[in-house]
């Protein structure tokens, strides 16, 4: 499965979080994506894959031979999306070979153009995935999840040497609780990167 198909699959699974909830995760729907990722991580070949009672998803890539003493790196992304716009039926729209014109968002009457979003100018000729205008897309942060999952798949399939890698997908980041119950002893990384950016090339 390529990164685009992964993202499209994840985007259609509704995972809105709920402000003011007293439990974690704040919505049970986040478990739907968590268990989907759990299954895929096992299929890819990650080890010690786990979804805990608070909807934190863990998985690990052991170091390849000769790289056991490298620093232990972690990658984190979040399962939830904002829940204050539109319905739960998220319908991604794929625009191939972008030509620079305004992109109509389905039949919603909304559109994206380079005046509002100047970085679209850097996407000429590329494939762009948008919402249909009736919901959020959820690229924050399902794009990050797709990137991390594809990285893991590529490292395993292409037998690319690497040190030990920890993966964690967290719930409730959009309401400020993403790292609240992350088990640092289990995650056990020397350094970690949160994959949750904006424009291409941003660090």
Indicate residue ranges for each PLM-predicted region.
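Acidic/His- and Gly-rich active-site-bordering loop/insert found
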Residues: 1-127
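Acidic/histidine-rich catalytic neighborhood of metal-dependent amide-processing enzymes
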Residues: 121-203
């Amino acid at each position: 499965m390529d990164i685009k198909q992964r993202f499209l699959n994840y985007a259609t699974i509704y995972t809105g979080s709920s402000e003011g909830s007293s439990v974690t995760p704040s919505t049970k729907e986040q478990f739907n994506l968590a268990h989907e990722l759990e299954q895929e991580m096992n299929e890819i070949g990650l080890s010690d894959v786990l979804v805990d009672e608070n909807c934190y998803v863990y998985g690990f890539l052991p170091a390849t031979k000769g790289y056991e003493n490298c620093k232990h790196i972690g990658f984190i992304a979040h399962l939830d999306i904002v829940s204050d716009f539109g319905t739960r039926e998220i319908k991604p729209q794929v625009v191939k070979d972008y030509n620079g014109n305004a992109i109509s968002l389905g039949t919603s009457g909304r559109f994206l153009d380079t005046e509002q979003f100047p970085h679209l100018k850097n996407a000429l000729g590329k494939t762009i995935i948008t919402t249909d205008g009736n919901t959020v897309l959820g690229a924050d942060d399902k794009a990050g999840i797709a990137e991390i999952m594809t990285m893991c798949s590529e490292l395993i399939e292409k037998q690319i040497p690497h040190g030990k890698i920890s993966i964690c997908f967290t719930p409730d980041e959009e309401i400020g609780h993403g790292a609240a119950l992350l088990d640092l002893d289990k995650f056990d990384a020397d350094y970690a990167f949160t994959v949750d950016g904006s424009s291409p090339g941003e660090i």
